[in-house]
Amino acid sequence: MARKLTAIIIVASFAVAGVAQAAGNAAAGKDKSAVCAGCHGDRGQGIAPNPALAGKPDADLVKALKDFKSGRVSSVMHGLTASLSDQDIENLAAYYASLK
């Protein structure tokens, strides 16, 4: 019984560690945001007709970026997101979510 409990704890700790690593890094996102700034502003404030990104929930930004990367809706955004890794997306989302 103790071995089963130990195994469960070890597996759970790996799962939690994987989630922690997937979290975005705002500083790394800022470094990647130069391409975004041309349409969304240097602080994510938005430049009409493009939406503001600053302060949006990171989960919403991650979903939108992944949808664009998969080709949903915008061919322009698809082209801009095609080369982003999942970690790049997490980082960009963390950066824009951190802005007010």
What is each model feature region?
Residues M1-A2, A28, A54:
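Generic N-terminal leader/processing signal
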Residues M1-A23, K100:
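N-terminal export/targeting leaders of redox proteins
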Residues F14-S33, I47, V62, D67:
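Electrostatic cytochrome c docking/interface patches
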Residues A34-D42, L92:
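The canonical Cys-X-X-Cys-His
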Residues G38-G41, K63-K66, S70:
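Regular, well-ordered alpha-helical segments
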Residues I47-A54, K66-K100:
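Axial heme c-ligation environment in periplasmic c-type cytochrome domains
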Residues D58:
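ATP/adenylate-binding site constellation spanning eukaryotic-like Ser/Thr protein kinases
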